[in-house]
Amino acid sequence: MRYAVLVTGPAGAGKSTFCASLITHAQTIGRSVHLVNLDPAADKFEYEPTIDIRDLINLEDVMEELEFGPNGGLIYCFEYLLNNLDWLEDELGAYEDDYLIIDCPGQIELYTHVPLLPRLATFLSTSLNFRTSAVYLIDSQFMQDKSKFFAGVMSAMSCMLSLGISMLCLMSKMDLVKDKKGRTKREVGRYLDPDPNLLLEDINQGTNSKFNQLNRAVVSLIEDQNIVSFLPLDVTSEDSVNTVLSHIDNMMQYGEDEEPKVPKDMDDGDFD
């Protein structure tokens, strides 16, 4: 069985750093993992990608030759990838019983406005028979701005519904908010398990009254759906990364269908 984790979220949320931490931890526990880069604009990685979309198409070349802007060029690159899925299938063909960590671009329009990442997720899970899940990261600094935080919640909800696969939401960079502003665990908990009333407490006072009805509609939507909650992520803590990996494994039922592997020396039948 093959496994794939799509690492998604807005730009600056810490996706690449999370990928590196996850790979480091997986290697320490003896798990075979591979990094797949799907960002044609990426410039550097802590771990060299095993599979890299830049070997197929490069954003800089697209922008120069077609005179596209960054977002239009990125969408073109992804459309090109989806029109050449045989390339991806060939690249993935050699990796049996392995765990792929797929670093995705930070432009949310790839899954909220155009169905590019959803099509990729479907291809992985149905055509290539990967057990596929996703994680969605938002920056813990969003807790300093409630309107920005709830925009992140709505974006996570949109991603979850668009991808149509199991998804884990992570509050990244928690190491940066420890002991700041005297936040108690209860206060942080209202963000990890989003309390819609947070939006109404201050937002209505700080915005034009004509937005009050919109704020109430957002609150009602979050309450009615009730599908987004966050797991805290501190990449400086091995326990935190291990907890996240355990949740991902549980989503994909990792290892449940694997046959016990017999050590090679026992295979040979030589016990001398």
Curated annotation (Swiss-Prot):
Stretches for region Disordered: 253-272
Protein name: GPN-loop GTPase 3
Described function: Small GTPase required for proper nuclear import of RNA polymerase II and III (RNAPII and RNAPIII). May act at an RNAP assembly step prior to nuclear import.
Similarity comment: Belongs to the GPN-loop GTPase family.
GO biological process per UniProt: mitotic sister chromatid cohesion; protein import into nucleus
Keyword GTP-binding tagged: yes
Residues at which GTP binds: G12, A13, G14, K15, S16, T17, S172, K173, M174, D175
Keyword S-adenosyl-L-methionine assigned: no
SUPFAM superfamilies named in the record: P-loop containing nucleoside triphosphate hydrolases (SSF52540)
Membrane-spanning parts: none
Gene3D superfamilies: P-loop containing nucleotide triphosphate hydrolases
PANTHER family per UniProt: GPN-LOOP GTPASE 3, XPA-BINDING PROTEIN 1-RELATED
GO molecular function annotation: GTP binding; GTPase activity
Pfam families the UniProt entry points to: ATP_bind_1
Keywords: GTP-binding, Hydrolase, Nucleotide-binding
Assembly information from the UniProt record: Heterodimers with GPN1 or GPN2. Binds to RNA polymerase II (RNAPII).
CDD domains reported in the protein's UniProt record: GPN3
Residue ranges annotated as motif Gly-Pro-Asn (GPN)-loop: 69-71
Organism: Cryptococcus neoformans var. neoformans serotype D (strain JEC21 / ATCC MYA-565) (Filobasidiella neoformans)
Site annotation Stabilizes the phosphate intermediate: residues: N71
